[in-house]
Amino acid sequence: MGASQTVLPFKLGATDESLTAHCGLALFGEYLRAIDVGGLIDHELPGPGSAAGYDPSAYVLPLVFMLAGGGRTLEDLRVLRNDTGLRSLLQLDDMPSSDATGDWLRRMGATASDGLKALQRVNRGVFRRLLRRDERTGYTLDIDATQIVAEKREAHYTYKGEKGYMPMVGHIAELGLVAGHEFREGNTAPAARNLEFMQACERKMPKEKRIAAVRADSAAYQAGIFNWCEETGKVFAIGADQDAAVKAVIAAIPESDWKTFRDGEIAETVHCMNKTNRAFRLIVMRRPRDQDLFEEQSPWRYHAVASNRDNEDATATMQWYSKRGDASENRIKELKIGFGMDTMPCGTFPANAVFFSIGALTYNLYLGFRSGALGSGWERSQVQTVRWRLFQTAGKVVRHGRQVFLKISAAMLDIFTAIRERCARIMREGGVVPETS
């Protein structure tokens, strides 16, 4: 093949026209403007130290757009910074560099700045606004700790033997929203401060809403959590820690009580801990274990769930508990893989805590955009699908006087128009995020 030959028969050429390969992100930006997220950020976060500095939203919003668009590192901000067409649509006239953004993350993470607490207030304001759009009053809280591997000098080893972090995340099962998050050191036990975390999530609920149910894995198998649920009228289903007492109770279940369930058998009994105020149901599932001829261990593998859900059989409770696989574990995967929270950009824990909080904010804003602006057919779309079908739409930005025109393919025109109309309606109906106090 000669030097001038190519595989496909097209030629390259440069243009001075204002083009963007991500003009669908302008729709996401229009939604953020409709609910005035930028105003909330500037109201809550510490401002610049001088008149020449950037407002907080000038740092946060580019990170939100970058994460929603598929970027994963601070260097990916350069793609947005160099996309003059998209920036003109988003009205990002002046944008900090990736190095300046990294410095800002470190400043916000410093204890004296109070930046992390301010971001929590922003997250709470957005969360409450989105929750108020839903007609329900009682919700299920799913919590789980998740490992983020990070070969940072200051990172600690997790219980899985890898250096990194172990944040705790709480989701509202019915809507998928992140109700709360706590960025934690890698050597923090998953069982640490579970009750305090649940209570913090509850405090973020609007006054007319409440957490009515709690689900968690065996890290939350704690008497304090069970007692709190009973005292506040919550139902719970929590994986049981198979300590000696639980094993003894399981061993005492009569063989006649076991019923076929899925690929194993299920039964239930009653149990209590030393410090629980009331006894609770213990639903036990067992599956056959592959055994060696000379092994003496039990032929069964057991999985137990503690619950106070009444008026239903063991299978119904186990099925309800199993739903946390989608409601919590899969949504954490979306937060980490879909929104880039599986890698941390900075070398210090506080700066990464700020970055993770912005990731959680982006996740919730995306859910609000999907449910409020995208319309029917998108309800369960993961962000990677929306990127491929919407965000990564090519367009040409044209200026005529003071007017800006976005030229897109005819096939996308009706979709863009409908989304923009929904964003305008959201703003007319009072889209501004409420006070965070």
Predicted features along the sequence, with ranges:
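An anionic, glycine-rich sequence signature occurring as long contiguous blocks
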Residues: 1-10, 14-17, 235-337, 422-437
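Dynamic "connector" segments at or just before major functional cores
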Residues: 1-164, 169-188, 194-207, 393-437
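Short amphipathic alpha-helical "interface-anchor" segments enriched in bulky aromatics
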Residues: 31, 77, 317-358, 362-369
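Structural preference for beta-strand elements that scaffold enzyme active sites
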Residues: 138-142, 211-213, 235-237
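Acidic, metal-coordinating catalytic cores used for nucleic-acid/nucleotide bond scission
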Residues: 214-222, 242-244
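Short, surface-exposed basic-aromatic patches at helix termini and helix-loop junctions that form
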Residues: 226-234
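Basic, amphipathic alpha-helical segments enriched in Lys/Arg and hydrophobic/aromatic residues
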Residues: 341-415
